[in-house]
Curated annotation (Swiss-Prot):
Underlying gene: tbx5
Function comment: DNA-binding protein that regulates the transcription of several genes and is involved in heart development and limb pattern formation. May bind to the core DNA motif of promoters.
One MF term in the entry's GO annotations: DNA-binding transcription factor activity
One Pfam family cited in the UniProt record for this chain: T-box
Protein name per the record: T-box transcription factor TBX5
CDD domains noted in UniProt: T-box_TBX4_5-like
Organism (species): Xenopus tropicalis (Western clawed frog)
GO biological process terms, semicolon-separated: animal organ development; cell-cell signaling; embryonic forelimb morphogenesis; embryonic limb morphogenesis; heart development; negative regulation of cardiac muscle cell proliferation; negative regulation of cell migration; negative regulation of cell population proliferation
Region (Disordered): 1-43, 254-312, 335-376
Compartments where found: Nucleus; Cytoplasm
Length: 519
């Protein structure tokens, strides 16, 4: 950039080839500036031969004068900030067919450092060393004289920065220093390269565009002027008539002002999966009216209250409800019923995953029968491995898919439709397993104890119990209600006939000596 300035013969750059010409031409330019002080008059600083007829007029000069009277300030940031007012000029006197390059630079206006105190600018010391000058080349360069003269030439994209290591080509300035923008019109020469010393150029300076760079506005009058005239500063303007009118409309009945806390409560309650039951039960008095269910039995809001005990006693009329009988095997996943508001559907249509804490309303005998079957079967599943069952269990025709281990919360209840039913065995005494011939070699050779053998058999029994739980009972499973739950306690290999010697104690077969040796 410094080489470019030397080539153009900038005033602060020593040029040995044409020093006298540059000194003579400013006098003529100063006479032009003194003779014409109208707002539309151009002010030229330096002009070379062949560029005499070019005139430049500052756009929005009145606005620049308003800022200049107060003391123009320009904000500089690390990322770069654009100027306001924008530097726009009108150029005339160019050769229509000749190509020109328009450049702009900002140079120090003096060698002082300033400070703002007592509502005025004053000199506080010597200026810091100036950074190497940077040139802003207009994006349309090079262009013909016709292109430059038919519209305003704007330097709106020029940015000011205080970052001395700026890599984006912004103009680097020091804070609290005074600067003067300059416009350069360079005649593009195809024979000579860009930046040749023989290239003709002219420089134009407008004193009302001088400003002081600052990181924040010091004079409140400058702040007010920029807010009033900058179209991008509408957010900083005060409550004028339009703003007051807009606020009055917002606070009217058409646009009620809702507190943010109320909005947050509504948003959080709508996203909660359990919020609708609580809000509908306690929030409105209209829930005392009865709503008809699918089975024709009415239920009130009192029926929907959760039970007082977390572990109710059997027969469990307030236990979780699983409507497996209403699901079809051919039902597609897209047809599954999802969570719906309570006011839109009846309780029997709700997903049991969310309704598990509520009691079942009084329904027909078919639903009660299925409910009791689920409770009895769960009791048998929970207590089968701890003690022999002493209470009768319903028949196999009542056994449905309502169990804790085989029913997923959102899918149908078909489990192992192609599996064979379990073979039912009569009751046998517990000691019969230790006298059978199939178990004698294992007990004598490996020295396994009775608890371990019984534990393995109970595991085998639990697997068969899971297989037999199907959603729709097979015809081959129809039996009388006299079938006891103890028939499921033993595997297939146990003989069905009971001989009298099987009721004797274990030591009569000769197993005690083997245990003593291995122990």
């Amino acid at each position: 950039m410094a080489d470019t300035e030397e080539a153009y013969g900038m005033p602060d750059t020593p040029v040995e080839a044409e020093p006298k010409e540059l000194q003579c031409e400013p006098k003529q330019d100063n006479q032009m500036g003194a003779s014409s002080k109208t707002p539309t008059s151009p002010q030229a600083a330096f002009t070379q031969q062949g560029m005499e007829g070019i005139k430049v007029f500052l756009h929005e000069r009145e606005l620049w004068l308003k800022f200049h009277e107060v003391g123009t300030e320009m904000i500089i940031t690390k990322a770069g900030r654009r100027m306001f007012p924008s530097y726009k000029v009108k150029v005339t006197g160019l050769n229509p067919k000749t190509k020109y390059i328009l450049l702009m630079d900002i140079v120090p206006a003096d060698d002082h450092r300033y400070k703002f105190a007592d509502n005025k600018w004053s000199v506080t010391g010597k200026a810091e060393p100036a950074m190497p000058g940077r040139l802003y080349v207009h994006p349309d360069s090079p262009a013909t004289g016709t292109h430059w003269m038919r519209q305003l030439v704007s330097s709106q994209k020029l940015k000011l920065t205080n970052n001395h290591l700026d890599p984006f080509g912004h103009i680097i300035l020091n804070s609290m220093h005074k600067y003067q923008p300059r416009l350069h019109i360079v005649k593009a020469d195809e024979n000579n390269g860009f930046g040749s010393k023989n290239t003709a150029f002219c420089t134009h300076v407008f004193s009302e565009t001088a400003f002081i760079a600052a990181t924040s506005y010091q004079n409140h009058k400058i702040t007010q002027l920029k807010i009033e005239n900058n179209p991008f500063a509408k957010g900083f303007r005060g409550s004028d008539d339009m703003e007051l009118h807009r606020m009055s409309r917002m606070q009217s009945k058409e646009y009620p002002v809702v507190p943010r806390s109320t909005v947050r409560q509504k948003v959080s309650s709508n996203h909660s999966p359990f919020s609708q039951e609580t809000r509908n039960i306690t929030g409105s008095s209209t829930l005392n009216s009865q709503y008809q269910c699918e089975n024709g039995v009415s239920s009130t809001s009192q029926d929907l209250l959760p039970p007082s005990s977390a572990y109710p006693s059997l027969p469990h009329e307030s236990a979780p409800i699983y409507h497996c009988t209403k699901r079809k095997v051919s039902e597609e996943p897209a047809e599954l019923s999802y969570k719906k508001p309570y006011m839109d559907t009846s309780p029997s249509e709700e997903d049991p995953y969310y309704r598990s804490g509520y009691p079942q309303p009084s329904s027909s005998s078919s639903s009660n029968n299925s409910f009791r079957t689920e409770s009895a079967q769960r009791q048998a599943c929970m207590y089968a491995s701890s003690a022999p069952a002493t209470e009768p269990v319903p028949s196999l025709e009542d056994i449905s898919c309502n169990s804790w281990s085989s029913v997923p919360p959102y899918s149908s209840c078909t489990v192992g439709g192609g599996m064979q039913p379990m073979e039912r065995l009569p009751y046998q005494h517990f000691s019969a397993h230790f006298t059978s011939s199939s178990l004698m070699p294992r007990l004598s050779n490996h020295g396994s104890t009775q608890p371990s053998d019984s534990h393995s058999m109970f595991q085998h029994q639990s697997t068969h119990q899971t297989i037999v739980r199907q959603c729709n009972p097979q015809p081959g499973l129809q039996q009388s209600s006299a079938l006891q739950s103890t028939e499921f306690l033993y595997p297939h290999s146990v003989p069905r006939t009971i001989s009298p010697h099987q009721y004797h104690s274990v030591h009569g077969v000769g197993m005690a000596p083997d245990w003593n040796e291995n122990s």
